Amino acid sequence: MNELTGESGSAAPSIALNDENTMPVLGLGVAELSDDETERAVSAALEVGCRLIDTAAAYGNEAAVGRAIAASGIPRAELFVTTKLATSDQGFKGAMDACEASLERLGLDYVDLYLIHWPAPALGTYVNSFGGMIQSRGNGHARSIGVSNFTEEYLTTVIDLTFVTPAVNQIELHPLLNQEALRKTNAEHNVVTQSYTPLALGKLNDHPTVNSVAAEYGKTASQVLLRWNLQLGNAVIFRSANAEHIASDFDVFDFELAAEHMDAINALNDGTRLRPDPDTYEGS
């Protein structure tokens, strides 16, 4: 057993961030979920012990997340809430104003993590945006600040020009795109890699390698994919609107994949990107 294992159904372990805060290693994301789906999913996740909820201004469901959190009765200090700066709000003042607007929608006094959603390099505003987020952290609106979808170039540019290192870089990461080089860069800068789309949009559910490993442990394909990602040392965000799937996906702390099975899943890497290319994408 390692620090990622424990009793089935227990809360997720936490990972240390570079700013002395901590973050649960596993949480629920709500991208592309309707308000009703979001409220149900967040409520279901909180019920099974999940304490990290990841939303974004661009998802349009921050208010629904806030309602589910309020209805849960769970003390704010026990929760870890992430939201993200929309590309349309980028800029120094834009980032600060957008953070306040997100807090209003969420019904919260602060977020635990505030991320730049996409670098949108063609706009040339991601460095100034991070500067605004530094201010948001300074005034207590965000406990930790970070980036999402940042390549090595954009990450190091932010660090070099603002003299502040993001706490987290949230990136697409699954066995088809294991991001080995970027994970190494993040680690060299003491930035936590947080994976999204860890289940590869279901494309690996019927893969013989994944299924054979799952059968070996008596687990689902999704559980094995999440466990693989966690054992790489990443924090992970998974998405589901189904309460049973949420409970199952969160229940990954009572087993450990052997090195041979980690290697077998790692071997599926072929560079397939299922989400937009950060170098060219200007949406969200």
From Swiss-Prot:
Protein family (similarity comment): Belongs to the aldo/keto reductase family.
EC numbers, comma separated: 1.1.1.-
Keyword Oxidoreductase on entry: yes
InterPro entries per record: AKR, Aldo/ket_reductase_CS, NADP_OxRdtase_dom, NADP_OxRdtase_dom_sf
Protein name: Aldo-keto reductase MAV_3816
Pfam families recorded: Aldo_ket_red (PF00248)
The keyword Oxidoreductase is assigned to this record: yes
CDD domains: AKR_AKR5H1
PROSITE patterns: ALDOKETO_REDUCTASE_2
SUPFAM superfamilies xrefs: NAD(P)-linked oxidoreductase
Domain of life of the native organism: Bacteria
Active site annotation, chain numbering: Y59 (proton donor)
Key words of the record: NADP, Oxidoreductase
Class of this enzyme: oxidoreductase
Residues at which NADPH binds: L199, I237, R239, S240, A241, S248, R275
GO function term, MF aspect, one: aldo-keto reductase (NADPH) activity
